[in-house]
Structures are given as C-alpha cells and as structure tokens.
C-alpha cells in the first residue's frame, strides 16, 4: 500500500508473456531481465501474472522474479479462494489482485480481511460504478479502474474520468490498461489517478531499456523515461 501511496504518480509495471487482448506478447520472454530493468527504472511495484491459461504465467516465474528483485510485487491471478491468498504470501507477494467481477461484496470483504491478517495489500479491480461501490463497501484501500472493454478489448480513458469521484480520497486510485504514452499518463494524472498499471513489454522484444534510477526523481522525468520504453517497443513491432 505504501509503495503506491506517495506524492506524485506511482508506476506498477507488469511482467507477462501473453494476454487475451494481444495473444502471445513475448515469444522470447526474458522475465528476469524485464523485472530487473523495471526495478532499475524506479518502478514502485512489479506486477507478475501467474495465471497459466490466458496469460501463460506461472508461480515459478513469480518466485524467480521475487528472488531477483527487492521492489514490492503484485501477484495477478484470478483469485477465487482464500487459499490463494495464503499461497501468495508464502510466495513472497506484497499485494494480490481481487477482481470485483468475480467476487460479490461479502466475499470481497472476507478476502480483504484475510489480506489484512496476512499483511498483504490488495488491488481491487473494477470496471464500472457498481463495482466501485462494491469495492468501497468491502473496505478496499487500493481501487483499480480497468479502462479496457472486456467484450471488444477497446480502451476508453474517459471511463477513468467518469468514475474518479466514486473513489474515496483516502484510497489509492490505480488506472489500468492501455497506457501507451506519457500523454496517457499525464491525462490520467490530471483526473486524479495516484498510480498507473503499465503492461509492458508489448512486443516480442528481448531487450528493455534500463534508464538510470536517478532520472526518476520527479514525475516529468519519470514520464519521459517511460516514453523511451514505449518508443523502443513500438519500433520493434
């Protein structure tokens, strides 16, 4: 929670081999190099997919990255049992993903209580106003708004703007999906996002830029560095 609750914009940078919207993203998947480069770039949190069917993730990949970096880590999976929360803690996760579309308010509150007992933070993902209300009622402290339409995979940042006022000021507001440029980050910052979740790399690139961590002292420089990542990956498509 503290990793993304700080002045300015926080960055949650993702390590994943595939996604439902893009298929296989990285045939050559140097996940340890990617994670280390995110850490060197000053990422506030590293997100790692462990879901095997749609994202081609694994618990072993998460564990290897956990052993290689000290940056806080988010385990992203379809969490549907409290067993997975205990498992995540044993794997070294600092945060887990809870998806409102999969959990009613009662179940979400129960899972959040288990997270509190285990010392885990939880990113509660929402897509619409009803899901945000459920997240708030359950006591979520980190609320993500996914700007991707899960029916056609299009991205609409106006969704983040429409829903912003429903998120309590004391909660961390994370904008998810489709962030492709510093202009996107600036737009999300202007509507009050506290953090962005960026699902790079989005090509089969085997190398990642490693900017100097000292460059990340302020938000403008931080966004410029992230734009370097985007430019390089776009050139390789």
Enumerate the predicted regions with their spans:
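Catalytic cores of alpha/beta
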Residues: 80-92, 127-138, 175, 179-198
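Conserved, mostly hydrophobic/aromatic
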Residues: 13, 38, 46, 88, ...
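Glycine-rich active-site/cofactor-binding loop and its immediate structural neighborhood
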Residues: 19-76
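Active-site beta-loop-alpha junctions enriched in small/polar residues
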Residues: 16-18, 51, 78, 101, ...
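Glycine-rich phosphate-binding active-site loops on the catalytic face of alpha/beta enzymes
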Residues: 87-107, 144-153, 191-232
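Glycine-enriched alpha-helix->loop->beta-strand junction motifs that scaffold or abut catalytic
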Residues: 42-43, 68-71, 90-96, 116-120, ...
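Active-site mouth loops of central-metabolism enzymes
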Residues: 12-30, 71-80, 121-126, 174-179
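Alpha-helix-loop-beta-strand connector modules within alpha/beta enzyme cores
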Residues: 1-9, 55-78, 100-101, 107-125, ...
